[in-house]
């Protein structure tokens, strides 16, 4: 199954600051996601409803906005991606 992948600005900003090879890997990962492949996993607890795509040491957080559309929301290094995303997510909910 093929999906439309909508890449949000925080993902573009993150990818732009990477070196060329990781940048290419992220683009390949997003293409794999578009065709329903890749190392994907649903997130749990306060991040339920979101998913992660693993690309090397990087993670892309995404969600389904329709049965055929995915929104790539956030990307960061594995060591901090979830806490930074959750912090942003909770902050936006409170405002």
Region spans (language model):
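Arg/Lys-rich, positively charged N-terminal/basic patches that mediate binding to nucleic acids
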Residues: 1-29
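Histidine-centered metal-chelating micro-motifs
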Residues: 59-60
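Enriched for short, Lys/Arg-rich terminal
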Residues: 2-5, 63-95
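Short, intrinsically disordered, mixed-charge
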Residues: 20, 31-35, 90
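A secondary-structure boundary/capping signal
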Residues: 43, 56, 74-77
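Conserved catalytic core of Hanks-type protein kinase domains
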Residues: 17, 32-33, 64, 75
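A short, surface-exposed loop/turn module that caps and links secondary-structure elements
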Residues: 28-54
């Amino acid at each position: 199954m093929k999906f439309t992948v909508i890449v949000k600005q925080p993902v573009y900003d993150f990818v732009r600051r990477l070196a060329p090879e990781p940048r290419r890997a992220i683009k390949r990962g997003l293409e794999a996601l578009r065709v329903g492949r890749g190392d994907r996993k649903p997130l749990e607890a306060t991040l339920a409803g979101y998913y992660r795509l693993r690309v090397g040491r990087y993670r892309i957080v995404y969600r389904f906005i329709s049965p055929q559309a995915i929104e790539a929301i956030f990307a960061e290094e594995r060591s901090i991606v979830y806490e930074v995303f959750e912090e942003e997510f909770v902050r936006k909910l409170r405002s």
